[in-house]
Amino acid sequence: MQLTHFGHSCLLAEFGQTRLLFDPGTFSHGFEGITGLSAILITHQHPDHIDVTRLPTLLEDNPAAELYADPQTAAQLGEPWRAVHVGDELPLAELTVRAVGGCHAVIHPEIPVIENISYLVGDSKHRARLMHPGDALFVPGEQVDVLATPAAAPWMKISEAVDYLRAVAPARAVPIHQAIVAPDARGIYYGRLTEMTTTDFQVLPEESAVTF
């Protein structure tokens, strides 16, 4: 598996010829020129996870890509987007993508909770090779190989980020959702996630593929 981080929550996961793109949002960059995608998967409707301005060009460049999103986002986007519900299993070539979670993390009690689908990607070697939770602290209750773990968010304290990484306890983790933090300050968050957990924590270089 190869992972490429395009900033914030946008990840490209490549399994041989099968290429999955998660959450191409407004805080992400460099995904515009990607071609050959097998699927585009959206966790939820917030703009930092789906940039509706740049999305049409991405779809034009990837006419064969299957398009999946949480039910609320799929309803907003319309056809050909498909709604993904908790419990769904999406067969994508040699992969199986499972939909789990269902709800966005609480930002404030007065702000309505929207839908959020977390994705578990399984290959021939691991049932949960990769997990992309979106904006949620969902614990799948099974061993995850690589977790794309939220590093910072308006809905999360650093203590909660540490506790989440401890709870999932993946073999490896890469941070996402860090665009809201100034680049010079991100080391504070990464340091806590590295020092206070036993997970192999690796910061991905932006727009460069890393093999796992």
Curated annotation (Swiss-Prot):
S-S bonds: none
Lineage top rank: taxon: Bacteria
SUPFAM superfamilies: Metallo-hydrolase/oxidoreductase
Annotated protein name in UniProt: Protein Rv0786c
